[in-house]
Amino acid sequence: MLPHGLIVSCQALPDEPLHSSFIMSKMALAAYEGGAVGIRANTKEDILAIKETVDLPVIGIVKRDYNHSDVFITATSKEVDELIESQCEVIALDATLQQRPKETLDELVSYIRTHAPNVEIMADIATVEEAKNAARLGFDYIGTTLHGYTSYTQGQLLYQNDFQFLKDVLQSVDAKVIAEGNVITPDMYKRVMDLGVHCSVVGGAITRPKEITKRFVQVMED
């Protein structure tokens, strides 16, 4: 089980300056030394490098685009197999109701339970309906990861109206809820923890210096 506390997302996509399994392992080490209780990471290679560097539970994902589907976070059993090989403690997957490129969501859950019974599963959702569906399918954790990042929630921010969407999710499911997506300040992190989430994932505000720099520059340009 993931501990209560701060999970730091250590990811860099191929077009980003820090794209490197070695660099992500050092980012994870910095997060560990700062007090993080877990890491969220993308790709088998990054996860293996991170697990060689820090003794923290890892939420693993594989981001991969597929034609004719907007689902790109651990979309099929191919990505699941890669994550099982990485020996991450938690596999996270897109649990939205969008059209999937291959297996259905419940088929993927069954696949993980069969092939990796000791691995927990996290649902990345965008709506309360999707949270309820994930709870019905037996996900161990439900994360607000994709709220604001789907075509039908675009422009919505997790912290709007004092985290009302997060409150709605917490009231709608019994599963452990993870706050993720636009938790961008220590005060926001404290607020979501006070609301009763099991843990919170913070990424860009900690591990994406290019984006952090752009925010500083932007305030003067605006």
Swiss-Prot record:
It is an enzyme of class 5 (isomerase). GO terms for cellular component: cytosol. GO terms for biological process: carbohydrate metabolic process; N-acetylmannosamine catabolic process; N-acetylneuraminate catabolic process. Pathway: Amino-sugar metabolism; N-acetylneuraminate degradation; D-fructose 6-phosphate from N-acetylneuraminate: step 3/5. Gene3D superfamilies: Aldolase class I. Signal peptide: none annotated. The keyword Chloroplast does not apply. Its EC number is 5.1.3.9. Keywords: Carbohydrate metabolism, Isomerase. It comes from the Bacteria. It catalyses: an N-acyl-D-glucosamine 6-phosphate = an N-acyl-D-mannosamine 6-phosphate. One of its GO terms (molecular function) is N-acylglucosamine-6-phosphate 2-epimerase activity. PANTHER family: N-ACETYLMANNOSAMINE-6-PHOSPHATE 2-EPIMERASE-RELATED. Converts N-acetylmannosamine-6-phosphate (ManNAc-6-P) to N-acetylglucosamine-6-phosphate (GlcNAc-6-P). Belongs to the NanE family. This is Putative N-acetylmannosamine-6-phosphate 2-epimerase.
